[in-house]
Design a protein with these regions (language model features):
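An acidic-aromatic substrate-binding cleft motif
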Residues: 118-181, 187
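Active-site-proximal segments of metal-dependent phosphoesterases and phosphodiesterases across multiple
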Residues: 152, 158, 279-321, 333
Length: 481
């Protein structure tokens, strides 16, 4: 308990210092957000966050606590239910509590989190009665503590809050789920993730993150997240794994692309699609860009990732893959077997495409350069159908799902400019997919290569986490230490 109080005191001092420092804000943060941030930082420990359950009938609620016991109190139509939380030990001596709210129906609910002397604010959310599902896609949020900018967290959390609010305002029927393509936190620190939870919408709309390479720089993500249907991979990242979520007609496959052990990813995709055979839309969400281009120094890595991942998407009929990492916005052609199946240049509507569309979005906070070191526009990927260079402005993408159409619209935050639109229609559940089964020898080669790469990655993470003083026994079996 003493360690817990000391840790929270240090974190509180850090956040307050970052929020009231004398350095001028690089971003014009209004007084309303500065006041909200000051109030939020006074009660830093909980970081209440709503994550998705298996489907719309569930919500996963998580928060930090000095107590290992707690519950969520849910109210609707005058009736109150309590959902007991389970506790996970956090290395700093605190706990991350998680409660699963079940049996939700179309209605408006209010909930509060309780643990020890802590009682959260009351948060209200709605379960939609319509069949239409609207998902918000963003990536590379990059909450960050910066040595050169003591106001970084307040500025970045404000920009993130504005991005969420802009998306909600532009969503005709509200937002059902927030999909994030990784790199939520620049250093993977708990303080950064606490800032991530500061927007009100992080407590009222389910947040579905994926693991990014920056999230792996420390272990905050491992304890911050509370997610359903997690894959038990033989080779997995220390901080997370694959999981799936089903909303309406859409199945979201949330992949940890930092983990290149493809045998586990194939096993996960097979189980998830089998459990959701009636889903019309299969959407993959991962971190690493494969087709956008713009960063020539990543060509070798992207080629390897395409060899590893695209056969899986072909085999399981993935309609769209959402990713980030490059911080550049791009949309590919319809791709099958790593080749263009349908050229999407100047097309905004397609029916029954036999392949996958890959969409990479820009960063919420870390904007990619418009020109390279030689003053040239960075080259796009050869299979990219549309690209957009953002001038230090966050983007977001809304995906609307019905039983026969997926409509994609991407916008700028500041002026809500619609930079890209695409509608994919299906005449039946399978559309044009042929579900190519990878040849056994190619799959064996892929498994072999992916395991070697994964061992190298795990070795790097093993050394990083060991230096930080964390328990690395999991890795010792994976790298033969």
């Amino acid at each position: 308990m003493k360690l817990m109080k000391k840790t929270l005191s240090l974190m509180l001092c850090l956040i307050i210092a970052l929020s009231v420092g004398s350095t001028a804000l690089a971003v014009d943060v209004p007084a309303s957000w500065q006041n909200k941030w000051a109030d939020y930082s006074k009660n830093i420990a909980p970081a209440v966050t709503m994550f998705p359950g298996s489907d719309e009938t569930e919500r996963y609620i998580a928060w930090y606590s000095s107590s290992d016991e707690g519950y969520v109190e849910l109210t609707a139509k005058g009736e109150t239910k309590k959902f007991t939380a389970t506790a996970t030990d956090v290395p700093d001596g605190s706990y991350r509590l998680g409660a699963v709210i079940t049996d939700l129906t179309a209605d408006t609910y209010a909930y509060t989190c309780h643990s020890g002397d802590f009682v959260s604010d009351k948060y209200e959310f709605t379960v939609d009665a319509t069949d239409k599902v609207t998902a918000l896609y963003i990536s590379d949020i990059h909450m960050a503590i910066e040595d050169e900018n003591e106001n970084a967290l307040i500025e970045r959390s404000y920009i993130y809050n504005e991005t969420l609010n802009a998306a909600l305002k532009n969503a005709d029927d509200g937002l059902d789920i927030i999909l994030s393509g990784g790199d939520q936190a620049s250093q993977g620190l708990t303080e950064e993730l606490i800032a991530l939870s500061s927007p009100e919408l992080m407590k009222t709309i389910p947040f579905a993150p994926t693991v990014g390479n920056h999230d792996r720089k420390s272990i905050g993500y491992k304890y911050y997240t509370f997610l359903p249907n997690q894959a038990d991979l033989a080779f997995k990242s220390y901080i997370g794994t694959d999981y799936w979520v089903r909303y309406g007609d859409a199945l979201f496959l949330m992949f940890d692309s930092c983990n290149t052990s493809m045998m586990g990813h194939y096993k996960f995709a097979k189980a998830a699609t089998k459990a959701n055979e009636d889903a019309t839309w299969v959407i993959a969400v991962m971190h690493h860009d494969m087709f956008g281009g713009r960063e020539p120094w990543l060509n070798s890595e992207n080629t390897l990732l395409r060899i590893l991942w695209t056969p899986l998407f072909d085999q399981y009929g993935v309609d769209m893959c959402l990713y980030g990492h490059s911080h550049y916005y791009s949309v590919s052609d319809v791709i099958y077997n790593n080749k263009t199946k349908v050229d999407l240049e100047d097309k905004n509507e397609i029916t029954d495409p036999a392949g996958t569309v890959y969409l990479s979005t820009g960063s919420v906070n870390n904007f990619a350069p418009l020109l390279d070191d030689d003053g040239n526009v960075p080259p796009v990927g050869e299979l990219a159908a549309f690209t957009y260079l953002e001038e230090e402005e966050p983007l977001y993408t809304l995906l609307d799902f019905t039983d026969d159409a997926l409509t994609v619209n991407s916008y700028t935050v500041d002026d809500s400019e619609n930079i890209y639109s695409l509608t994919i229609s299906k005449s039946d559940k399978d559309g044009g997919h042929t579900f190519r089964n990878t040849k056994w020898y190619m799959r064996g080669f892929t498994y072999f290569v992916s395991v070697i790469v994964n061992i190298i990655n795990n070795s790097d993470m093993y050394n990083r986490y060991k230096d930080q003083g964390f328990d690395v026994s999991l890795y010792e079996g994976l790298i033969g230490s």
